[in-house]
Regions:
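Acidic, His/Gly-rich catalytic cores of divalent-metal-dependent hydrolytic chemistry
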Residues: 2, 6-30, 44, 186-282
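N-terminal active-site segment of His-dependent metallophosphoesterases
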Residues: 2-98
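Beta-strand-turn-beta hairpins that frame and shape the catalytic cleft
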Residues: 43-50, 159-166, 235
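Residues at the starts of beta-strands that form the adenosine-phosphate
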Residues: 48, 78-80, 107, 237, ...
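Active-site neighborhood of phospho(di)ester-bond hydrolases with catalytic His/Asp-centered motifs
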Residues: 52-53, 81-85, 110-114, 168, ...
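Active-site environment of divalent metal-dependent phosphoester hydrolases
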Residues: 56-60, 89-92, 115-120, 174-175, ...
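Short amphipathic alpha-helical segments
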Residues: 63-64, 95-96, 123-124, 179-180, ...
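Active-site neighborhood of divalent metal-dependent phosphoester bond hydrolases
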Residues: 76-78, 90-200
Length: 282
């Protein structure tokens, strides 16, 4: 009851400061569809499907990757491109990446990554206070009903039953139903540790416990990003595609349907855009 009353008071304050629609968006950045389901009718529109690792605002490398993906293809729109999250942040052209996905939603979709969430939070803070860190000043150019709403609606998972695959940014806890997975785990986890009660819990640290993907036993094959330190990961039931393009390494993608199924495509980073050894605030 107290929480409900507090939420009501907070909503009332924001409705005074902002329009009711803006207040709703600021207070609720959970997407309308948390777990997006690609039905067979949608999938049958495409001849190929490829899943792309973390782009992190590296627009030029992303375009080079698309050139390789589309090479020799009569109709690039027949290839569904799915990003494993972290479209933006850290790289030099986050707005360009964001707008590309916004303009090509018929054949380019993405799950939400932790850095997408960080920028959602930063934008909300900017709208509320007018304050923004210099490194995030590009967010000032975004629109509430356009860019922000697109980010806000990024789902946490994309599931393709026809292919028995699921895309998530960070990972899933084994033996926990999809509906009971914690939102923060799906965008931040890397490993699994056992607590004192022999219950497995998620951790974002990869120096304790074991990589969650190494113990994942299905039923879906999971494609994920987030874990650039481990680079390309290929396990029986999970494939990690974050190969650290923003850190000067590669941008990697894998075909999961069509004549090139199983093939990896990658491009080298044009330079190191972010030093992984230099600690920065989110």
């Amino acid at each position: 009851m107290v929480k409900m009353m507090l939420a009501s008071v907070i909503r009332r304050i924001y409705s005074i400061l902002f329009s009711s629609r803006t207040a709703d968006k600021i207070l609720n950045n959970i997407p309308s569809i948390v777990h997006y389901h690609c039905d067979d009718e949608f999938i049958e529109k495409f001849e190929e499907i490829i899943i792309i690792g973390d782009i992190h605002g590296c627009y030029d490398e992303f375009q080079l990757l698309l050139e390789r993906i589309h090479q020799g293809v009569d109709n690039p729109k027949k290839i569904l491109k799915i990003c494993a999250g972290d479209l933006i942040n850290k790289g030099p052209k986050s707005k360009e990446v964001l707008e590309y996905f916004m303009k090509n939603q018929d054949d380019c979709i993405s799950v939400r990554g932790n850095h997408d969430q960080v920028m959602i939070n930063e934008y909300i803070n900017y709208i509320k206070t007018g304050d923004i860190a210099e490194k995030n000043s590009w967010l000032k150019e975004l629109t509430l009903d356009g860019h922000f709403e697109f980010l806000r609606q990024l789902p946490y998972t994309i599931r393709i039953p026809k292919l028995n695959i699921l895309i998530v940014h960070a990972g899933l806890l084994p033996d926990v139903s999809l509906e009971n997975q914690q939102l923060v785990d799906m965008i931040e986890m890397r490993n699994i540790v056992e607590n004192g009660d022999n219950v497995r819990v998620a951790t974002k640290h990869n120096d304790e416990g074991v990589a969650w993907a190494s113990v994942w036993q299905g039923p879906w094959h999971i494609y994920f990003g987030h874990d650039a330190r481990r680079k390309l990961q290929e396990h029986p039931y999970a494939t990690g595609l974050d190969t650290g393009v923003v850190y000067g390494n590669e941008l990697t993608a894998k075909f999961v349907m069509g004549p090139r199924k199983g093939h990896l495509v990658s491009v080298k980073a044009l330079q190191m855009w972010n030093d992984p050894n230099k600690k920065t605030k989110k």
